[in-house]
Regions:
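N-terminal targeting/export leaders
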Residues: 2-150
């Protein structure tokens, strides 16, 4: 009976430590929602883990069917990866925008490598190229000063 009484607190302590460790890992894995004003962005880039610019392009207004403004950039290789290519896009409402939809798509990258997507020198997101060399990211970026979404 004494052994059982001693085991119960030890098991309880181990469970508490395991739950606490899990919660810390979960909280460390969360990141804050990105903010930034890309409504007048001019340059989109894809950089490799060494910071070299693999793809680069200039944003320009694109024709849009709905009531949004869309800016697109054709991403062209810079000599770091000769067959890499991609596109970047920023889309937002014409009237009182609060959120921008930011998209990057790159292909023919080094499979398994990590890339950073950059707009006007500001890191927006990172992604790892899949086994075919494709890397994509799509996210909503809140404009500075815009109310937080629920």
């Amino acid at each position: 009976m004494t052994n059982k009484v001693q085991i119960i607190p030890v098991v309880g302590l181990l469970c508490t430590v395991a739950v606490a460790g899990y919660m810390v890992a979960q909280l460390n894995g969360q990141s804050t929602a990105p903010t930034g004003d890309y409504t007048n962005a001019s340059v989109a880039e894809v950089r490799d883990a060494q910071g070299q610019i693999v793809l680069s392009g200039q944003f320009a207004i694109a024709e849009e069917e709905d009531d949004d403004i869309e800016r697109k950039a054709a991403l062209e290789q810079t000599g770091v990866d000769a067959d890499a290519a991609g596109e970047a896009e920023v889309e937002f409402a014409k009237a009182a925008p609060t959120v921008q939809e930011v998209e990057f798509a790159a292909r023919n990258l080094q499979p398994g490598a990590t890339f950073t997507f950059v707009i006007d020198g500001q890191d927006v997101a990172t992604a790892t190229a899949d086994r075919r060399g494709n890397a994509e990211v799509e996210l909503e970026v809140r404009l500075p000063g815009a109310p937080a979404s629920r």
